[in-house]
Regions:
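Short catalytic/metal-binding and nucleic-acid-binding patches
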Residues: 1-97
Length: 97
């Protein structure tokens, strides 16, 4: 059963998207993760160091892992960095009612 979630991915003090190409890659990686997990995006907002998303999915963990891995791999290669971009545990709230 698909549930709706508010997801917040925080990068702490790191800037998630430094230029327009980063934003485009982020949105494309999000679209691919949504398509792969048969989810639907209801709303999103990309801030300088964190991202908010409202998503309806039955495969929440897979969606978040796929999205974080794809974008972090791109970001690390582009900016010659290593390690996680986002904090280990995303903020997730089930939206019901």
């Amino acid at each position: 059963m698909k549930n709706a979630y508010h997801i917040c991915l925080s990068a702490g003090s790191e800037v998630c998207c430094r230029d327009e190409e980063d934003y485009l890659y982020y949105f494309n990686s999000l679209a691919l993760a949504i398509a792969h997990t048969e989810s639907s995006l209801m709303a999103d907002s990309v801030m300088s160091n964190h991202i908010h998303e409202c998503i309806r999915t039955a495969r929440l963990v897979e969606l978040i892992k796929r999205q974080r891995y794809t974008y972090t791999r791109y970001f690390n290669a582009k900016y010659l960095r290593r390690g996680s971009l986002f904090m280990r545990h995303p903020f997730v709230i089930v939206l019901d009612g």
